[in-house]
Design a protein with these regions (language model features):
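Radical SAM enzyme [4Fe-4S]-AdoMet core and its adjacent flexible, acidic
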Residues: 1-64, 103
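Flexible mid-to-C-terminal extensions adjoining Fe-S/redox cofactors in radical SAM and related proteins
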Residues: 57-120
Length: 120
């Protein structure tokens, strides 16, 4: 009753979990399913216009607008920032969405306004 929408992420392959990483083809298939769910009215908080960037991992990282507190340590974006090369494999949808938003991507801006006004 209190959940208004869900948000999805891909696995970010930390050194001890690389085998869980998805291929580009698997990411595309996941995004197709999520997009279909959205089309059918499922309450999904992700931005469809960010999917191509997520599939190809071609969005700016790290997200300087996001901070994470974990085990008493404050990190820009998340603890993955401390692992060399991991940002380039980021699976966090919010990172793509926010970095593209703050870079002025018009599609992202429009869709974020529409989505956030719908669920917040």
């Amino acid at each position: 009753k209190n959940v208004r929408a869900v948000s999805f992420n891909f696995h970010t392959p930390y050194p001890d979990t690389r085998e869980l990483a998805l291929s580009k083809e698997e990411k595309a298939a996941c995004c197709d399913v999520i997009a279909q769910m959205m089309k059918e009215g499922a309450p999904v908080f992700n931005l469809k216009s960010a999917f191509p960037y997520l599939i190809e991992n071609r969005f700016p990282t790290p997200c300087h607008q996001c901070v994470v507190m974990e085990n008493g340590k404050l990190s820009t974006c998340g603890r993955c920032i401390d692992v060399p090369g991991l940002c380039e494999q980021c699976g966090y949808f919010f990172v793509a969405e926010y970095t593209l938003l703050f870079r002025g991507n018009p599609k992202i801006i429009f869709e974020m306004l529409r989505t956030y006004l719908k669920y917040i």
